[in-house]
Design a protein with these regions (language model features):
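Glycine/serine-rich anion-binding loops at beta->alpha junctions
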Residues: 1-21
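Extended polybasic, low-complexity segments that bind anionic RNA or targeting/receptor surfaces
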Residues: 22-143
Length: 143
């Protein structure tokens, strides 16, 4: 009768059976070349610099973490959120001051991404983080 060839009744050819070629897990990660990634970061930073939405912050003014002081700095500057704050790893007071503000993203230069720079309407970089940001966006490879 051919019944033995069919296998189980849960095989794809039977009603109520499985799916022959179901959708599987798929990774949508895309590899971007290092030079292209750096060029994109340079372009995004240049855009902020040209539009006047890039500010350099003196981290020394934050002796202790103060969200109130951080909010005052942003209000004094007068730029709309969202804001990206790039601070050096050692500037813990700045990181703690800005991290609790709404629509403010705080990151370190080693984790700076093009998407975050493009997302932000304003960019604040501390003096300690500025050389590291320049190095990350530079044309030459960094060690």
């Amino acid at each position: 009768t051919g019944r033995a060839r069919q296998g189980t009744i849960r095989a794809p050819q039977f009603t109520g059976g499985g799916v022959a070629f179901p959708p599987g897990m798929r990774s949508f990660d895309v590899k971007v070349n290092r030079k292209a990634r750096r060029a994109a970061l340079r372009g995004a930073l240049s855009h902020h610099a040209a539009n006047g939405t890039l500010a350099v912050l003196d981290a020394g003014s934050f002796e202790s973490p103060s969200t109130k002081q951080a909010k005052g700095v942003l209000e004094e500057w007068g730029k709309d959120a969202p804001v990206l704050v790039v601070a050096h790893e050692d500037e813990e007071a700045v990181v703690r001051s800005f991290r609790n503000l709404e629509r403010v993203l705080v990151t370190v230069p080693a984790e700076l991404e093009v998407a975050a720079v493009v997302w932000a309407r304003a960019l604040v970089v501390t003096e300690g983080a500025l050389p590291l940001v320049e190095q990350r966006a530079g044309k030459e490879a960094s060690a």
